[in-house]
């Protein structure tokens, strides 16, 4: 690493000339910022709503302790021990696992292909409420509930706000570890917690809010009895997405962590803070849904945008203030996570340059990475999140490209009850048949929509590849390697290099050897069967 060149004024470097955080507080704020993101404030509440409330929370907490903490410690250890980003780090530990490093770079790339789009949407919503506070209506719709559907089908607006959000990310990453990432997170994370508390207190005093708390915290394990694997895979996917595990982010941030800092203590704080924010977000969304939406908590990803917008609209003028605070904190959470993922991609090229004796080129590669991801964001911007007119998905969806969207109904003599039939127009658009009003026509060719939940739009496609398959696969292989190949002593040695005694060696050894690999194998099985079964 002797070729590293300090490009940014004020950038902190370690003894090996690698950039580092200026303080442990800076590292913690950045790592918590990476972990706390849309996964907490968008994913956690809607997945809890769709998975039975308390049952989901219970499984999530167990996984966070038995799997999340172990994987977090493992990734931070690999990063600090090697002082390198994922590809170079895994190659240094064992060339056989170099593919793991490449996967750890591919995952954040895939995640950013939809994460940047959602981040841009959050910015637009925050601006809408900010201007509404001062009496300016920038929603441009007669009924505020119509804005979501209008916005996601406006490709130009989606691209514009995505581009703005990406530009902010590129600026922060180009500024460097200490001058960009650390400075933002030191301000952003405390601000996020303050805004969370303000909105929580306001929602808590609304009539009906108590029912939302009962849904979250009232003992109910019936969903586990009905479909345990479904709840398990949903909670596991959420945990990895929320904690930024399996994305290379914690390996990259760990490589910037100074030797005197405690890996275990930092890992525990990160997991606790991340889980706390997720629960706090649930304490906003769930009670609000019961107070203003009659307890409708399972509206999926639209919960963050459509449902919460309706909630704030019903609050009257104060809803503009609460709406701005809510989407401002979501913005902070989103950008602190997204630039950590862009940093993974950027550091891959920076480390490669340094190893070849070249200047790091951080600014150039941060901008280049942002531009490349932007190109792959375009399908997500343009497909209306699957809300087009082509049988529920726009032309050009993954299902269309893969030839998995439409199939002829075959030789049928009548409409089957409970089945949706479509006819193909001359323009190539499939229209749903109103079987209650239209008589069966034997001369007509009817089609069935065979698209899956993971290929009906680009967001779900990117999510399936990253969160659904690669993240649990990466955690499973990494845990297996630590437990059986590199051994727990590698983790203990690196953690104790800071002068802090490693606690729970036997517990973590069992986690790495058995609990995490076996648990992730079950999750992978559940994910793959749900996607392709």
Name each model-derived stretch.
Residues 3-42, 71-76, 80-92, 98-99, ...:
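Membrane-interface "cap" regions at the ends of multi-pass membrane proteins
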Residues 15-21, 182, 186-339, 350-368:
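Membrane-embedded translocation segments of transport machinery
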Residues 15-18, 47-51, 84-103, 116-174, ...:
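Inter-helical loop and helix-membrane interface segments of multi-pass membrane transporters/permeases
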Residues 23-61, 248-249, 254, 265-268, ...:
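Transmembrane helix-boundary motif of multi-pass solute transporters/channels
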Residues 26, 34, 159-160, 273-279, ...:
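Loop-to-transmembrane helix boundary motifs in multi-pass membrane proteins
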Residues 48-74, 157-158, 467-475:
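Extracellular loop-to-transmembrane helix junctions
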Residues 68-87, 97-147, 331-350, 472, ...:
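Hydrophobic transmembrane alpha-helices that form the core helical bundles
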Residues 346, 353, 357-370, 406-410, ...:
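C-terminal membrane-solvent junction of multi-pass transporters and transport-like membrane proteins
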